[in-house]
Amino acid sequence: MAGVARMLAAVVCAIMPAAAMAAGGVGALEPSGWVRAHATFYGGADASGTMGGACGYGNLYAQGYGTRTAALSTALFNDGLACGQCYKLVCDRKTDRTWCKPGVSVTITATNFCPPNWDLPSDSGGWCNPPRPHFDMAQPAWEKIGIYRGGIIPVIYQRVPCMKKGGVRFTINGHDYFQLVLLTNVGAAGSIKAMDVKGSKSPDWMAMAHNWGAQWHSLAYLTGQGLSFRVTITDGQTLVFPNVVRPGWRFGQTFASNIQFK
């Protein structure tokens, strides 16, 4: 185990964003220790069956998550607050040399929920039953570390920073007095701890509430106003995205910022 950990260890620079809108003085997420779990796969050889899901990301190809994704068990999913987190997984050859591929790892993003199956025991089909940590991975990601016929493999995993290109994106859905905001392409910790919104006609920040998956909502009347967001991710970093949503926006639109967590 120690040899695998040394081989895969990554050095992460805790660099705070230089932009003046950064706040907090908290360093970026560093890799966690290694933890044991198991992993299965779903979604087909092209991962087309992984689209949608309990994080609300929709088309994972279009959103940039691709096929390196997984559904998390209850023990990891945290009612959707883990959406967007990244994990590095290695098949544990000390436990299973038959179905584990040697010397390789894969990094996935949490994009879905693997529900419990109370009709089956936790060690025989009810893989996602609490309190088991379990990854139901997109098949192409799973096959990076496991041999297809194995079906289920023991893994060791660690949470790692998410590496993203471009800025955080905001998709606005809902209706008047209910703005439902989906965040995608979130770097560093990947998952959201808190979020505030301010309209161009509003003097103050207004706290948003976690709705489901990677989506947060506001009950204020903000239709048509330019919108700024203040986002805190789960490693404690806070960034302000000023006027990222232009006045006159419509529900269903996505707005890409040029700001990213590091």
Curated annotation (Swiss-Prot):
Pfam families for the chain: DPBB_1, Expansin_C
GO cellular component, one term: membrane
S-S pairs: none
Keyword vocabulary terms for this entry: Cell wall, Cell wall biogenesis/degradation, Membrane, Secreted, Signal
Tissue-level expression: Expressed in roots and flowers.
InterPro entries named among the record's database cross-references: Expan_Lol_pI (IPR007118), Expansin (IPR002963), Expansin/allergen_DPBB_dom (IPR007112), Expansin_CBD (IPR007117), Expansin_CBD_sf (IPR036749), RlpA-like_DPBB (IPR009009), RlpA-like_sf (IPR036908)
A GO BP entry: plant-type cell wall loosening
Residue stretches making up the Expansin-like EG45 domain: 52-167
Domain Expansin-like CBD: 177-257
PROSITE patterns the UniProt entry points to: EXPANSIN_CBD (PS50843), EXPANSIN_EG45 (PS50842)
Membrane topology: Peripheral membrane protein
Role: May cause loosening and extension of plant cell walls by disrupting non-covalent bonding between cellulose microfibrils and matrix glucans. No enzymatic activity has been found. May be required for rapid internodal elongation in deepwater rice during submergence.
Protein name: Expansin-A13
Record organism: Oryza sativa subsp. japonica (Rice)
The gene coding this protein: EXPA13
